[in-house]
Amino acid sequence: MRTFAIGDIHGGLKALIQVLNKLEIKEGDKLIFMGDYVDGWSESAQVVQFLIDVSQKFKCVFIKGNHDVWCQDWLKTATVNASWYMHGGKETMESYEGFSEEEKKQHLVFFEKLPLYHIDAENRLFLHAGFTSLHGVEKEPFKELFYTDRSLWEMLLVMDNRIEKDSMYYPKRIQHYKEIYIGHTPTTKYNESLPINIANVWNIDTGAAFKGK
């Protein structure tokens, strides 16, 4: 069985289809999507429907991202968050034109069921953004940090790579897991179009919202 982690999609349906075609998914493979399915490109609603359909054929895990929280709130209450509207929400709302109320309800259920993180059988952690508890995600007191935190990644960016894992200076919160996979902060921010690996953490948000990668 193969496991594939797929970073932030942000309404990029065509790019998503290209990725899955290249992977040549087989029965028994596992797809882990890292959140932020909407807001960015013009086909957010279509991405959500596509993911729902894919989950009927393959084993999928869908993590919740901060943009998914915004879209969920809009689908549930029709309230438009001003920050969301300015950061892709407008395009997402437009993508839902032509979708029936029943289809929108189906998408709301999809968003409401999204887990905040996933730990697989190999003790690999998958979550959208980060966490702050030194005792691991199970002890995180502020659940919204799973899809908003950047302190984990920013800590790693300035970490001295000479620090050994058994050192007292090695970050305690990343010691709990074999590997950690996150999105949320585009690697293009650091002039890199590929995933970035620091210590046992992989940032796989390669900027699909901006450059479609």
Predicted segments, located by residue:
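Conserved beta-sheet core of the metallophosphoesterase superfamily
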Residues: 164-213
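Beta-strand-turn-beta hairpins that frame and shape the catalytic cleft
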Residues: 1-4, 119-125
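N-terminal active-site segment of His-dependent metallophosphoesterases
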Residues: 1-50
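A general structural motif
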Residues: 26-28, 57-59, 176-178
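Active-site glycine-centered loops adjacent to acidic/histidine catalytic or metal-binding residues
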Residues: 8, 35-36, 65-66, 183-184, ...
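Short hydrophobic beta-strand that contains or immediately precedes a catalytic carboxylate
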Residues: 5-7, 126-127, 203-205
